[in-house]
Each structure stands twice: as C-alpha cells, then as structure tokens.
Amino acid sequence: MEVKAIVKDTGYSALKVRLCVDMVRGKKVSEAITMLRFMTSPTAKVVSKVIKSAAANAENNFQMNPADLKISQIYADEARMLKRMRPQARGRVSPILKRSSHITVVVAD
C-alpha cells in the first residue's frame, strides 16, 4: 500500500529541492532522515519533515509499521513564482522571479 504526503509552496526553488530529493529516493525512511540530518542545505529540513509526515500518515491512518517503510516516489515540482522588479542603471528595471516548489513523498512497505 502506498501513502502520500504533500507540502505546497515551499520557499525554495524546485532545482535546489531536487538536489536533496534525488539523494533519498528509494531509501528506507529511517535511513533517509539520517542522511538529511547531516546535509547542510536548508531544504533538507523541509524534505525531512515531509518524509516524517508521510511515515506518520502510514502509521496512524493505515496501521503500517514505520520501520518497514521505503520511499517509493519523491519529487519536487515547480510552484507559483512571485514576480518582483529590481532597479537597474539608467532608469531601467529587470525582473526577479522568486521561485517556490511543491514536494510530494510516497512511501510503501
């Protein structure tokens, strides 16, 4: 059985989140959380929370053993972008895109 957890509109770009996500894909939940704990990227904390949420969903809603859970799917999709303007020389402006992402984790036993 597969159980899903999603976090939407994180304050990090999908490109940065995918660096953490690619490292833990296919690992056991406990092993993935341990790996993320020692990463220096601030996105690792967000990814870790989503994995813990998926494991808690499996344990509380479907009475699955959290020790047996494995990350079957994990991915980061692009979310909305905040568009801002930055002043430049000679009265011009250039756009700044503040990107965000949706993180989805699917665990299975």
UniProtKB/Swiss-Prot annotation:
GO MF entry, a single one: rRNA binding
One Pfam short name: Ribosomal_L22
Disulfide-bond pairs as recorded: none
BP GO annotations: translation
Coiled coil feature spans: none
SUPFAM superfamilies: Ribosomal protein L22 (SSF54843)
Gene3D superfamilies: Ribosomal protein L22/L17
A cellular component term, taken from the record's GO annotations: cytosolic large ribosomal subunit
InterPro entries assigned to the protein according to its UniProt record, in alphabetical order: Ribosomal_uL22, Ribosomal_uL22_bac/chlpt-type, Ribosomal_uL22_bac/org-type, Ribosomal_uL22_sf
Record key words, sorted: Ribonucleoprotein, Ribosomal protein, RNA-binding, rRNA-binding
Quaternary organization: Part of the 50S ribosomal subunit.
Function: This protein binds specifically to 23S rRNA; its binding is stimulated by other ribosomal proteins, e.g. L4, L17, and L20. It is important during the early stages of 50S assembly. It makes multiple contacts with different domains of the 23S rRNA in the assembled 50S subunit and ribosome. The globular domain of the protein is located near the polypeptide exit tunnel on the outside of the subunit, while an extended beta-hairpin is found that lines the wall of the exit tunnel in the center of the 70S ribosome.
NCBIfam families reported in the protein's UniProt record: rplV_bact
Similarity remark: Belongs to the universal ribosomal protein uL22 family.
Protein name: Large ribosomal subunit protein uL22
Organism classification: Bacteria, Bacillati, Chloroflexota, Dehalococcoidia, Dehalococcoidales
Name of the encoding gene: rplV
